[in-house]
């Protein structure tokens, strides 16, 4: 179903484009509308075409009595426009085409093209290439590439110690139970003024 809708929309766009091109060709052939560069309605183009055809018929009928200068002044210079208009007839194989006016191609914004002088300077200069050295280098035997070995001596750099390189005897937490308290010797006391006073102990060496 989406393919059918897409084809129908494409046919409709083609039809509208063909009609617009036909009206553009008709406008270019009308002296009264040729100077208008902006868009003109289709109804105005048709009315101007009818008036122009009537004027042509009258001039053709009275061309023997009217001088050529008056005809040129009335109709203006008839210049064929290089715009192509394709008219489809009853037979699908018969198509009448007129010369097409070259239209400027609409390029996307991301595409850029180099001008001719710059593009010409970018062409390679083959006159400076030494083909003899290239041919001799192509015949030379290939030189085996030496891969670096993991056992080859590596370059030495100044060694910096880390925390893992220092000894561990600076701080070693002890896991043994604390020692029992030392036994205290019995202390002697003196009675002074009916009070019990501890006697100082003396250590003998």
Curated annotation (Swiss-Prot):
Main subcellular location of this protein, as a coarse class: nucleus
A GO CC annotation given for this chain: RNA polymerase II transcription regulator complex
Domain bHLH: 3-56
Entry-linked SMART domains: HLH
Keyword DNA-binding: yes
Annotated PROSITE patterns: BHLH
Signal peptide: none
UniProt keyword annotation of Transcription present: yes
Assigned keywords, A-Z: DNA-binding, Nucleus, Transcription, Transcription regulation
Region (Helix-loop-helix motif) location: 17-56
Compartment list: Nucleus
SUPFAM superfamilies in alphabetical order: HLH, helix-loop-helix DNA-binding domain
Tissue-specific expression: Expressed in the ADL sensory neurons.
Effect of inactivating the gene: RNAi-mediated knockdown in a rrf-3 RNAi hypersensitive mutant background leads to decreased expression of srh-234 in the cell body of ADL sensory neurons.
Function: Acts as a transcriptional regulator. May mediate transcriptional activation by binding to the E-box motif 5'-CANNTG-3'. Required for the correct morphology, terminal identity and function of the ADL sensory neurons by controlling the expression of the ADL-specific gene repertoire, including chemoreceptor encoding genes, ion channel encoding genes, neuropeptides and the neurotransmitter eat-4. Regulates the expression of the srh-234 chemoreceptor encoding gene in the ADL neurons under feeding conditions.
Protein name per UniProt: Helix-loop-helix protein 4
Organism: Caenorhabditis elegans
GN (gene name): hlh-4
């Amino acid at each position: 179903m989406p393919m059918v809708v897409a084809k129908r929309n494409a046919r409709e766009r083609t039809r509208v484009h063909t009609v617009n091109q036909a009206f553009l060709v008709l406008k270019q052939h009308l002296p009264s509308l040729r100077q208008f560069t902006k868009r003109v309605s289709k109804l105005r183009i048709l009315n101007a075409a009818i008036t122009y055809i009537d004027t042509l018929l009258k001039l053709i009928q009275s061309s023997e009595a009217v001088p050529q200068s008056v005809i040129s002044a009335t109709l203006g210079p008839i210049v064929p426009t290089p715009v192509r208009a394709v008219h489809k007839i009853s037979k699908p194989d018969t198509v009448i085409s007129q010369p097409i006016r070259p239209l400027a191609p609409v390029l996307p914004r991301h595409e850029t093209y180099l001008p001719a002088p710059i593009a010409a300077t970018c062409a390679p200069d083959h006159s400076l290439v030494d083909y003899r050295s290239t041919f001799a280098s192509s015949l030379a035997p290939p030189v085996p590439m030496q891969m670096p070995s993991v056992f080859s001596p590596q370059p030495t750099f100044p060694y910096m110690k880390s925390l893992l390189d220092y000894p561990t005897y600076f701080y070693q937490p002890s896991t043994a139970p604390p020692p029992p308290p030392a036994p205290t010797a019995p202390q002697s006391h003196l009675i002074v003024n009916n009070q019990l006073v501890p006697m100082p102990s003396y250590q003998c060496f």
